[in-house]
Swiss-Prot record:
Keywords: Ribonucleoprotein, Ribosomal protein, RNA-binding, rRNA-binding. Binds to the 23S rRNA. GO terms for biological process: translation. InterPro entries: Ribosomal_bL9, Ribosomal_bL9/RNase_H1_N, Ribosomal_bL9_bac/chp, Ribosomal_bL9_C, Ribosomal_bL9_C_sf, Ribosomal_bL9_N, Ribosomal_bL9_N_sf. SUPFAM superfamilies: L9 N-domain-like, Ribosomal protein L9 C-domain. The lineage of its organism: Bacteria, Pseudomonadati, Chlorobiota, Chlorobiia, Chlorobiales. The keyword Ribonucleoprotein applies. It comes from Chlorobium limicola (strain DSM 245 / NBRC 103803 / 6330). Belongs to the bacterial ribosomal protein bL9 family. PROSITE patterns: RIBOSOMAL_L9. This is Large ribosomal subunit protein bL9. It comes from the Bacteria. One of its GO terms (cellular component) is ribonucleoprotein complex.
Length: 151
């Protein structure tokens, strides 16, 4: 029997795949558990339509991420932190601080999508990577300045 998987099933395939399985496996386990539906002409057409819509949606999200990446590449953020006389920070600059600086510029990115190569513990210029979409990553340039110069 041919079925369309609604969920990822180990050893069978991913959601949306059309696979052939034994009738008993489909009727007694996969279909009652909501893991699959029968592959009829109507469901196959609906699956194709859904895949096309999903592809359009993903392409639009990718385009938006690329536009945002261009905007971010042109920015140089300023992150303010308390520092001693030697330029050593009292603490570290984290991805949350960079996300907050981006937010102040009107760009919302989740802090978990921003990665620093090494802990930032000194004043100066640095780079961080921000993953905007599946295959769209951008370098975020930021400068750490002493908090006293911010006021």
């Amino acid at each position: 029997m041919k079925i369309i998987l609604r969920k990822d099933v180990a050893a069978l395939g991913d959601a949306g795949d059309v696979v052939a399985v034994k009738n008993g496996y489909a009727n007694n386990y996969l279909i009652p558990q909501g893991m699959a539906i029968r592959a009829t002409e109507g469901t196959l057409k609906a699956l194709e339509t859904e895949k096309k819509q999903q592809a359009k949606k993903i392409e639009q999200q990718r385009k938006n991420a690329r536009d945002l990446a261009q905007k971010i590449e042109q920015m140089t953020l300023k992150v303010y932190a308390k520092a001693g006389e030697s330029g050593k920070l009292f603490g570290t600059v984290t991805s949350a601080d960079i996300a907050e600086a981006l937010s102040a510029q009107g760009v919302e990115i989740d802090r978990r999508k921003i990665t620093l190569e090494a802990p930032v513990k000194l004043l100066g210029k640095y780079e961080a990577d921000a993953k905007l979409f599946m295959d769209v990553t951008v370098k975020v340039n930021f400068e750490v300045e002493a908090e006293s110069s911010a006021s």
